[in-house]
Amino acid sequence: MRLPLIDSHCHLDAPEFDADREQVMAEAVQAGVVGIVIPAYVASRWSALLDFCAAPRPQGPVCWPALGLHPVHLSAHQDDDLTLLEDLLRKHPEVVAVGEIGLDRFLPELAEPSAWARQVRLFEAQLMLARERDLPVILHARRCHAQILASLKRVGHRSGGILHAFSGSVEEARQYAAHGLHLGLGGPLTWPQSARLRTVATSLPLSALVIETDAPDLVSYPHSSQHADGRPRQPGERVRNSPAWLPDVLDTFAALRPEPREVLAAAFRENTVRALRLPPSSLVLEP
């Protein structure tokens, strides 16, 4: 049965969707996706994202923008971007969060001392902007959970948000939850070998969890062998993820947890609304 869902993290503004974005959204609506949170990742795309999310879509889905400087795109960021971000947050109350922001030690070039110092500086500056405007954050963290938590405490951000694509331990998940953050789980959870993530999915209270696709990245296991147009994936090819495949994540949770699928869907929707303070109408939208 199709159930109303919110994709709490989808880069629908990415160039990978330029050729068929409207079709992707139509397919998402058909799958039950009533809302999509779109976190920007570089300043050059902020204006276009705001315009895209403001466009009326009578058939859905509702699209909510978040603005931020993603750590993986460190080389693209300018110091003046922080001034622009502050200005846009002041002028655009429809922005639901500061994100995608965070820290990344997975890529070797980002772990170099100078790059790491710049990551931390930009991250904490954006946390400060979020704190000043009492906005939630959408966080990226790879191999740096202790540092992320330390920055949150140092800056004093307590306005909640989502740690997206969570890949840490149960204990780390509980630390984020204690700080008022929700944990976003998506495609990686659906893969059979994801034992650690599945432990997180079953150990945390349902109230701490949200679901996401992170499209075009992190494709779910059921859709990993062929492209959206039905072509089989060839060796070395990457399958573009889609918000229409968000039900794969719901189905995995339903197989792992005792709650009925309908209860899970409603909880994930309500948790996303609460985490990002989305308009209450998000709770009653029909797919």
PLM feature segments, named:
Residues 1-287:
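Mid-domain alpha/beta scaffold segments of enzyme catalytic cores
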